[in-house]
Amino acid sequence: MLTETEGRAAVKLARKTIEIFLSKGKSPRPDASGVELSPVFEEYRGVFVTLTEGGLLRGCIGHPYPDSTLKEAILDSAISAATRDPRFPTVEQDEMKNILVEVTILTQPEKINASPKELPDKVEIGKHGLIVKQGYCQGLLLPQVAPENDMDSIDFLSHTCMKAGLSPDAWVKGAEVYCFEGQIFKEKEPDGEVIEEKF
């Protein structure tokens, strides 16, 4: 778990990384952001960076698995959310004054070993994020997606399947389901106070 101070640093690092990248056109080094980073940023963690503008999603990309240090994962995810999310055009530099930055630190995903009938009861809304895998298809939804969209566990499972490009009932038909938890830090206003969001 990150402290509030570390959570603020994670969000500031994501914002500064995007701002530097958009102004200079290249990825900054983590220490170029001017954000003081504690030793936790050297640990290997999964992370997602989410950008919203006017209450609407503007970009969301991350590392589901702990495949790099937290600081490197934040740098990569921040730049990708702003410039490589295929659902949206690249963020413009002057847009950043209207964009809220959110960073979700993930636990290691764990497979849910349960029958399809038992599966919905294993999913805790507001606590769990989900990954659904089948063949070459994989989809992920963060823990905050379900409560923010008034989903129950069946809705959440179905939407994660659709995110993977599968039918909504793939979780009933043998797709593998993994859960993880997320610690969410977000700006209350653009480049403003950072809070930890809990559901």
Curated annotation (Swiss-Prot):
> InterPro entries in the record, alphabetically?
AMMECR1 (IPR023473), AMMECR1_dom_sf (IPR036071), AMMECR1_domain (IPR002733), AMMECR1_N (IPR027485), AmmeMemoSam_A (IPR027623), Uncharacterised_MJ0810 (IPR023472)
Locate the AMMECR1 domain: which residues?
5-196
Top-rank taxon, per record: Archaea
Identify the SUPFAM superfamilies for this entry.
AMMECR1-like
**Entries under PANTHER family matching the protein:** AMME SYNDROME CANDIDATE GENE 1 PROTEIN (PTHR13016:SF0), AMMECR1 HOMOLOG (PTHR13016)
Q: Which NCBIfam families match?
A: AmmeMemoSam_A, PRK00801.1, TIGR00296 family protein
Q: What is this protein called?
A: Protein MM_0484
